[in-house]
Regions:
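RNase H-like two-metal-ion nuclease catalytic core shared by retroviral integrases
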Residues: 66-67, 80, 100-122, 142
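Active-site beta-loop-alpha junctions of metal-dependent nucleic acid enzymes
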Residues: 35-60, 82
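Polar, glycine-rich mid-to-C-terminal structural blocks
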Residues: 124-197
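Conserved small/polar residues in nucleotide/adenosyl-binding loops
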Residues: 198-205
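Mobile-element integrase/transposase regions
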Residues: 1-33, 42-48, 94, 180-181, ...
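RNase H-like polynucleotidyl transferase catalytic core
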Residues: 82, 88-90, 94-111, 130-131
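Acidic/histidine-rich, metal-coordinating catalytic segments
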Residues: 60-81
């Protein structure tokens, strides 16, 4: 499941303010979390985030539950309508091979896997005013992500990283490098360093 935590406002020790968004992709079986800081929730950053997430995970989930954001859905899914997927997002899904599962508007329980764990990201706000710069902020976010994947998850009774090692075997293979490079949007990377990506080092073991 995918979601954004949007427009977090953070202050450094010198008073400088930094506004950022956090992308979250959480695997269903293991509850393994992939979080990244992004300056924008635009479609370009969406594709960039998901592509880097898939590469870090070593594969692609068979389906992804999404909300009705305009970067993904042209028309929201409701009780009476399937909605309409944004054509560029549909092409992205086709290129990576996953199925899109839109949430039904006004039924928030369909996103609980993402939104409950996203509360953990609010831990970063406990460091508001205590850090010196963006680099320290990113390091703290990495610590929070790794801790979340390493501690026991109440829903499954064991740390997500342990279940992820098995779930990883069932991920779809990544497409070719040309497709991945296209969606990672090197122009964004060159200008803004794009999303800052974090996942547990243990995932590569």
């Amino acid at each position: 499941q995918f979601d954004w935590k949007e427009k977090l406002k953070f202050s450094f020790k010198n008073g400088e303010e930094f506004i950022f968004n956090v992308g979250s992709l959480i695997l269903s079986a293991s509850r393994f979390k992939y979080w990244a800081i992004c300056p924008s929730t635009s479609q370009a950053y969406l594709f960039d985030f998901l592509t880097n997430a898939f590469e870090a995970l070593g594969g692609v989930p068979k389906e992804i539950v999404i909300d009705n954001a305009s970067t993904m859905m042209d028309k929201a899914r409701t009780e009476r309508s399937d909605g309409k997927v944004n054509p560029k997002f549909q092409q992205f899904a086709d290129d990576f091979g996953f199925n899109i599962v839109p949430c039904i508007r006004a039924r928030p329980n369909t996103k609980v896997k993402v939104e409950n764990p996203m509360r953990v990201i609010d831990e970063i706000m406990t460091y508001n005013g205590l850090l010196n710069n963006e680099e320290e902020l990113f390091e703290k976010m990495q610590e929070i992500t790794n801790e979340a994947n390493s501690r026991v998850c109440q829903e499954i009774g064991i740390p997500p990283i342990l279940v992820f090692k098995k779930e990883k075997e069932h991920l779809l293979p990544l497409p070719n490098d040309k497709i991945c490079s296209y969606y990672k949007n090197t122009t964004i990377h060159a200008k803004v360093n794009s999303c800052l990506l974090y996942t547990s080092d243990a995932a590569d073991e």
